[in-house]
Amino acid sequence: MISSTSLFAPVDPELRLLTDNLKRLISARHPILGAAAEHLFEAGGKRIRPAIVLLVSYATLLKEELTPRHQRLAEITEMIHTASLVHDDVVDEAALRRNVPTVNSLFDNRIAVLAGDFLFAQSSWYLANLENLEVVKLLSEVIRDFAEGEILQSINRFDTDLSLDAYLDKSYYKTASLIANSAKAAGVLSEVSSEMADSLYHYGRDLGLAFQIVDDILDFTTSTEILGKPAGSDLISGNITAPALYAMEEKPYLNTLIEREFSEVGDIEMALNLVKDSDGIWRSRELAAYHAKLAGKQLDCLKPSAAKASLLALTDYVLSRLY
């Protein structure tokens, strides 16, 4: 499997600064809010979203050093992403993320919601200080999309009439919007043409969709220890994703289990087995590969560089997580 460390080599110095800068940017007057926010950044993660911002910045600037505004955009992007995770964990009543206790399990839901709100507020403040109205609009749209995606997921729980298009819309709002709009924002700060900015947006959109589809596959195929959350947790909570949508076409009884919300003994195990015994996972892999390929084609607008090579390799990295 391709390692994220090698992929992000062109922006390694900037990523090393990221965590320290984030802790400084979110320092709060109240110690509990500060402790909750710091715990989030200590939990780690691959920092894929800020890395994409930094790589796009290098690929469009073609200079040896980034501007402070590009670096700050990467930090804002990670701040927004982290805030969304905090709220997700509250809504999902999750106790673990990446095998680390969530803020809501360490503190409580009230503190977790406030910590997420605080991060969104801080990101908005630093976003405004970039003094670029188009970038402000792009990242503000992301925050709106997060809320819309969460609402869609909530109202569509256990809905066996959910379409693939509706699933992809929700996946865009919850995952791809941030990657798409932050990639475009990096291009805007580099003063690229509107055509190139749109290509960067579509790169992020399709990469983000591929990333989410792969995550949804891993929810069925990966152990709890590796996944950092209970296997099959999406389906159990009524969140119907691509593997289950495809499996429902092939295994009609899965619809029955979902509609009765796994209320009988053995329903969950049977549902997970029906998904695994269908072509749902294979078809989802094909769907992820389709979007990853579309993402790669959007990079034709960029001149050759180490940063462009890493952005292109990311489309393979996303799929390599399946193997």
Q: Where are the language model's segments positioned?
A:
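All-alpha prenyltransferase/terpene-synthase fold signal
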Residues: M1-Y323
